[in-house]
Amino acid sequence: MAGDTTITIVGNLTADPELRFTPSGAAVANFTVASTPRIYDRQTGEWKDGEALFLRCNIWREAAENVAESLTRGARVIVSGRLKQRSFETREGEKRTVIEVEVDEIGPSLRYATAKVNKASRSGGFGSGSRPAPAQTSSASGDDPWGSAPASGSFGGGDDEPPF
């Protein structure tokens, strides 16, 4: 990865991510990010849209399942990954080359939105192809030390002195 070209893109998803599975069971999500630069025109005093850049992206394994479950068309995202060149031949026999982003990290942009993040539970390792249901509960569990306030005192004891 030392010679890879890394890129960070901020843009919007042009469609819902497309989730597929390889014959071996590895998940892959494909999606396109549209990034449009904004240019300030000093003569008119207005912001104008520049030419949009559309980049095809792919992400693998558990992260692919998380992307497909979490992100939808129009979502503003921040993508970090590596540019990859791929050549293929069309059904008509024409050779084509595309540049894609192999995504390392992705998340929603919080500049104009809010998000609630739930940690995904791991149950089956890489390539399991199963999507565990998120464990959400509205009441505090007895096993969760952060789920409720301390029983007494500000430091868990009965006095007002810190324990150190």
UniProtKB/Swiss-Prot annotation:
Pfam families: SSB. Residues 1-110 form the SSB domain. GO terms for molecular function: enzyme activator activity; single-stranded DNA binding. Residues 120-164 are annotated as: Disordered. The keyword rRNA processing does not apply. SUPFAM superfamilies: Nucleic acid-binding proteins (SSF50249). Keywords: DNA-binding. PROSITE patterns: SSB (PS50935). InterPro entries: NA-bd_OB-fold, Primosome_PriB/ssb, ssDNA-bd. GO terms for cellular component: extracellular region; nucleoid; plasma membrane. It comes from the Bacteria. One of its GO terms (biological process) is DNA replication. HAMAP family: SSB. Homotetramer. Interacts with DnaB. Binds single-stranded (ss)DNA. At low concentrations (0.02 to 0.16 uM), stimulates the 5'-3' helicase activity of DnaB. At higher concentrtions eventually totally inhibits DnaB helicase. This is Single-stranded DNA-binding protein. It comes from Mycobacterium tuberculosis (strain ATCC 25618 / H37Rv). The gene is ssb.
